[in-house]
Amino acid sequence: MQRSIATVSLSGTLPEKLEAIAAAGFDGVEIFENDLLYYAGSPRQVRQMCADLGIAITLFQPFRDFEGCRRDRLQKNLDRAERKFDLMQELGTDLVLVCSNVQADALGDEQLLVDDLRLLGEHAGKRGLRIGYEALAWGRHVNTYQQVWNLVRQADHPALGVILDSFHTLSLKGDPSAIRDIPGDKIFFVQMADAPILAMDVLEWSRHFRCFPGQGEMDMAGFLAPILATGYRGPLSLEIFNDGFRAAPTRQNAADGLRSLLYLEEQTRLRLEQENTPIEPGVLFSPPPASAYDGVEFLEFAVDEAVGARLGNWLKRLGFAEAGKHRSKEVQLLRQGDINIVLNAEPYSFGHNFFEAHGPSLCATALRVKDQQAALKRATAFRGQPFRGLVGPNECEVPAVRAPDGSLLYLVEQGTAGHTLYDTDFSLDNNATATGGLRRIDHMALALPAESLDSWVLFYKSLFDFAADDEVVLPDPYGLVKSRALRSQCGTLRLPLNISENRNTAIAHALSSYRGSGVHHIAFDCDDIFREVARAKLAGVPLLEIPLNYYDDLAARFDFDDEFLSELAYYNVLYDRDAQGGELFHVYTEPFEERFFFEIIQRKAGYAGYGAANVAVRLAAMAKARSGAARKPVL
C-alpha cells in the first residue's frame, strides 16, 4: 500500500518536512493548507520538490464548512472551492479532504446535505478532481462515518467518496465493523491516528494528543481490517496533531511515523488472518516473526578504570563474583545466579565513547533470544539501525541494534555449556563463587525525556513485539512522574519507562546526570528477601532508609504482627499486596555515585506489578537521601 503522512504531523518548514518524509521512506504526503500558506514558493515549486524527492502528493487538505452552509453563502463557498481546485492542479493532486461542517448555524436537512455534496462533486469532476468527505467527531450534524457514507451514497457522484479517519471513529467509541458495507472503490482515502484514552473534550483530545499507531491505546488494527476487507488498496496515511510532535526532531519523528505504519500493517495482517479474511500477498508489510525471548543475557556498563573498580566493589558487596576478564579488552565479567554484568573500560571502544558522553552508565543490554539472526532481520525490517563493533581473533560476534538513545541492544542465543560467548571471549575463573542469592534480572527502569516516551514505546513494540501497559502517574515530592511499562510476550523482559516534566524530580536528576536518557534502576529477583538484605547490610551495601511512619501505615492497612513489622522496618523492606493475594517485598540501594540504583525484589503468589503503592515513599526517601537528611530506623 502507498504509505503517506500529513505535513501537519511534523515540525519544521515545508521543505524540511518533505525532505524528512522522503528520507524516512514514505511514498506520499498530504499537503496541509497552512504549510503551503507559510511557504514562500509557489504550489508548482512544491510539486517539483516532491517529484525530485520521489514522493507523491496524495491529498490536499482541509476544505471546511461547505455542506449545509447558509444559502446566502453557498455561491461564495463554491467560488472558494474553485480557487482550491486551481491550487490542487498546480500541486498535481486530484483529491481534497472536505470535513463535515462544524458551524453553529449549519443546516442539517439530509436532502440539502446530499444536494450540496453532489454539487461540489460535479464542480470537482468537471476538472478531473475528486472530493473526499470526512466526518469530524465534533461535526455539527455529521460526526460518524455511517452518516458520511449515507450522504455520499445518496449523492451518487463518481467524483465524491468517503475519507475514513481512525481517531474520529474510535474517539466516539464507534464500531468500525460496518465499514465492510462500504464499497472499496468509494473509500477514497484512509487516515490513521492513535491516542491515549482520555476523558476530555474530543476536539481538544484530537488537536493535542494524537500519536502514531502503536503509541497510544486505540485499536488501530481493528479499524483498518474492515477497510481492507472492502477491497480498498489506496493510500494509508498518518494525520497527527500533537504538541510534542510539533517540537520533535523532524527526521526522527518521520522515521517513527513510517515505523508505526509498518507495525500497523503487520498487526492488521495478523488480525485478518485470525478472522480468516483472505488478502493478497504483498499488500501489507510482512516482517519475520518476533523471536522468543528468555530474559537478559548480560548488562554492560560503560566505565573507566577508576569507576570500574568502584562499581565492581559495589557489585561484589551485593554478592557478585568476579568471574573473568576479557581475553583482549579491558572488560570485566561479574556473575551471580543467572545475572551477568560486564564492566567495559576498553579505550577507543563504543563503551569508551558512551562513557565520555554520559559518564558511568548502562551502555548495552543483551537480550537472550531463540534465533538471533531472525531477531536481527526483524529489527532491521522495522528500520532498526544495526551495529557492528570491533571483534578480535576467535571472539564471538554478537549482532546488535541501536536503541533510540544510542545505547546498544545485543541479540544473544544461549550457547551450550562450554560454548558460550563467555567461554570464547573471557578468561573465566572457574573457582569464582557468588556470595549472594540473587537469581535474575526482574526489570530495568529507564529515565527518558518526556518527548521521547512514545518513540521508545513504538521501538520496542515493533522491533521486539513487546506489549505496553497503560500509563500510570506517580507522585514525587517535587512533581509528577509518568510511567509506562513494556514487557516481552513471555514476561521475562520488563522495562518501565519513566518521564517527568518537572525539573527537580528523581527522573529529572537522572536525566541531568546522564546528559540524556538512561537506565536508572535495575531490579534483581531473589528467593529470600530478608536473607539477601541481611547479607547486603553486613557487606556494607548502602540501603535506602525508609521512614518509620511508612511501617505504622502498613500496620493500619495489613494485619501484621509487631515482630514482622519490626523486621520489615529494620531491613527497610517495602511491602505490597495485590487484589489476588500476591505479595511483593522489595528494598533499594542508594544510588551509585548519584546515578543508578539497584533493587532487591521477592515476588510471591503471582504478584506481577512494580509496587506502585510504594513509589511515593521511595521517591521521598531518595529525595531525603540526596539532601543527606535520611533518618535511620530505631527499633
Swiss-Prot record:
Pfam families: AP_endonuc_2 (PF01261), Glyoxalase (PF00903), Glyoxalase_5 (PF14696). CDD domains: HPPD_N_like. It catalyses: 3-dehydroshikimate = 3,4-dihydroxybenzoate + H2O. Pathway: Aromatic compound metabolism; 3,4-dihydroxybenzoate biosynthesis. Residues 295-414, 440-590 form the VOC domain. Keywords: Cobalt, Lyase, Magnesium, Manganese, Metal-binding, Nickel. GO terms for biological process: 3,4-dihydroxybenzoate biosynthetic process; quinate catabolic process; shikimate catabolic process. A divalent metal cation binds at residues 134, 165, 191, 239. Requires a divalent metal cation for DSD activity, with a preference for Co(2+) but can also use Ni(2+), Mn(2+) and Mg(2+). Mg(2+) binds at residues 443, 521, 599. Its cofactor is Co(2+); Ni(2+); Mg(2+); Mn(2+). GO terms for molecular function: 3-dehydroshikimate dehydratase activity; magnesium ion binding. Consists of a fusion of two distinct domains: an N-terminal sugar phosphate isomerase-like domain associated with DSD activity and a C-terminal hydroxyphenyl-pyruvate dioxygenase-like domain. This C-terminal domain does not show any 4-hydroxyphenylpyruvate dioxygenase (HPPD) or protocatechuate dioxygenase (PCD) activity, but appears to be important for optimal DSD activity of QuiC1 in vivo. HAMAP family: DSD (MF_02238). Homodimer. Belongs to the bacterial two-domain DSD family. This is 3-dehydroshikimate dehydratase. The lineage of its organism: Bacteria, Pseudomonadati, Pseudomonadota, Gammaproteobacteria, Pseudomonadales. The gene is quiC1.
